[in-house]
């Protein structure tokens, strides 16, 4: 009995030691400091990278704890039910971050040392998260612009379904009601159309009207593709799919132009020429998106297969 008791005591002590070691290792991924707004250094780099891994932080990983990092921390704390939602990164927040994310330190530090533009999102291979060289960017842009100049007869004609714009003598309210009645296709609800308009407004306001229709068309093309979710909301809110969702602009009030662009896309106008992807060449950092076969450029966006 004494021997068995000794063995049990040793097992308990061993378990306690292992648990303590694991918890210590978990915390030690960061230093012991409480990270807060205004902080700089490696702790902040890791913080930003881990937050970006799960999509909470979409800014530059630069080791400077500014307002963007602050709100990302608060959103993370709130999402995971932490007691303190205050932007202060103490032991509990660090533990939760380590549990819910990954940090590829060597990759991040290499990119910072080289001065590269890069990201650290989860579920995307790291080799696709470093912005290509200026030479590669310029070459791809020139190719897209060259293709844009080629005749594309199938997209130059706008469908006649939008001919109601010439009815200037009809009251605006009546025209709006007529457009909804005439253009609302089966299978799309008012909520679908509003959500599409919010996405178009968040992604492409200020772009040429053709470019706004093209954004709506890309969403519809994804809806019809087996590679993407089978609902409007599913496509739009798919993780990392749209910048407007990541930065909250999806919730802005869309204007009538965005709504009209959605209706034109639903009625068959596809200036994107069946594109499934698009990106802004001035801000895109992913070699993966740059490597997609490019169809054309409209305004600030390049549309891809």
Curated annotation (Swiss-Prot):
GO BP, one annotated term: sporulation resulting in formation of a cellular spore
Bias kind Basic and acidic residues: ranges: 142-156
Swiss-Prot/TrEMBL induction comment: Expression is sigma G-dependent.
Location(s), subcellular: Forespore
InterPro entries in UniProt: Cell_wall_hydrolase_SleB, Peptidoglycan-bd-like, PGBD-like_sf, PGBDSf, SleB_dom1, Spore_cortex_SleB
GO-annotated molecular function: hydrolase activity
Keyword Hydrolase assigned: yes
Any one GO cellular component localisation term in the record: intracellular immature spore
Extra remark beyond the main annotation: B.subtilis SleB could not be detected with anti-B.cereus SleB antiserum and vice versa.
Function: Could be a lytic transglycosylase. Required for spore cortex hydrolysis during germination. Interacts strongly but noncovalently with spore components.
Protein's UniProt name: Spore cortex-lytic enzyme
Organism annotation: Bacillus subtilis (strain 168)
Taxon lineage: Bacteria, Bacillati, Bacillota, Bacilli, Bacillales
Gene this protein is translated from: sleB
